[in-house]
Amino acid sequence: MSALALELKKEGNFVSGSDLKPTELTKKLESQGITVYYGHRRSNLRSADFVIANGAINEDNPEIKEANLRGIKIKTRAELLGEVSRRYKNIIAVSGAHGKTTTTEMIAEIFIHAGKKPTVHIGGISKYFNSNLLLGKKKLFITEACEYKNSFLSLNPTTSVILNIEREHLDFFKTFANVKKSFEKFEEKSKICVKLDKKRNIAYTKKLCVEGKNISHLGSGKYGYDAFCNNKYLGKIYLNAIGKHNVLNSLCAICVSLIYKIPFNKISEALLNFKGVKRRYEIVSENPLVVCDYAHHPTEIKKMILSTKRFTKNKIIVAFQPHTYSRTKTLLHEFLSALRLADEVHIIKTYSARESFDFDGSAKHLSELLKNSYYHSSMNSAYKKIKERLTGKETLLILGAGNIDELAEMFSG
């Protein structure tokens, strides 16, 4: 949402918005001349011509009520993203249950390094351009494409990427079959679709097949491999990103780059010097090693723990903040299986987002079902207990999509 607000502001529009409390993003918006109100009130609308609401906002929101009362046009974030994207000649949209932000960033860094000057919308703060928005020329728009509430169907991609499909957002989709149908529609709307075959380590379209062979661990959780396209050897890739799953993300980024005729040397250079995104395996402290990541789905948590175990023999402590009661309840057994890979777990009160309390999907219930687990009702209590448990022989993974980055900030000092 903030990236769209910034783009509209830079186009000369008066933009205001509201959030519950100040964050790094809201402070940045204010520094760019955007008015930010803290708390949701009818008076915040003032003389707005239209209102943009994200997926977490419901009809009971006082600003939505006021907009309806005054007949002000209400658009979803997805609708606005679709409108903005259509101003560009080419649209690259990256979808999937996991890896969207990192893969979008890989594509963006490659295209920028190759001098393509894209406009980029990303679901995190890029370490390459220090924002979630980069404004370029009107030829190329690179964005994440989220499936929640069929949001990505507002886009008409020139090139789409489908990284993976999982049982996610079932509070909206209800069944996995509906999730798959939504992705099928997204693929149909795309002129070219890049998909993954993770068993064969290939990213492919109808005309291209990019394969990673001779994958090897280079140390510190990073990987290298030989890249091929349509069975022709391209060269070596040395990937500056932790985790074997990022090999698959990079194959998709390479495939997209080749579609747009980017030379392989530019691709390999960009991936060698890949900067990444904040809260994506972000190391916030070296001693002890503390890592912050957006992982909030069992598959992502599992990858984080296993990737870390690949390069350290330290005890693994996980601090995890569940994101929504419905996700935790629906995937409870998967969460338990993933978290049991850690040596010790600290579960922090659920980030409920748009939902009402449900004990069966709560952080407390999740914690009660785990051994070597501690439940915390606040970030401060979590920090004190974890700090007490650290001896210098542990690696701490701070995971979640809510405000658990506040805990990471406590350890970064």
Region spans (language model):
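Nucleotide phosphate-binding/pyrophosphate-handling subdomain across enzymes
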Residues: L4-E7, E11, Y88, G219-G221, ...
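Phosphate-binding loop of NTP-binding sites
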Residues: E7-N13, E30-S31, S43-R46, G55, ...
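NAD(P)-binding Rossmann-fold cofactor-contacting core
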Residues: E11-K28
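Structural beta-sheet core signal
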Residues: G17, V120, S160, K195, ...
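Beta-strand->loop->alpha-helix junctions that form or flank phosphate-binding loops
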Residues: D19, Y37-H40, K75-G82, H121-G123, ...
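Short acidic low-complexity segments
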Residues: T35-S47, S378-I386
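A glycine-rich beta-strand to alpha-helix segment
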Residues: A48, S381-G413
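C-terminal helical cap/extension that packs against the catalytic core
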Residues: L336-E394
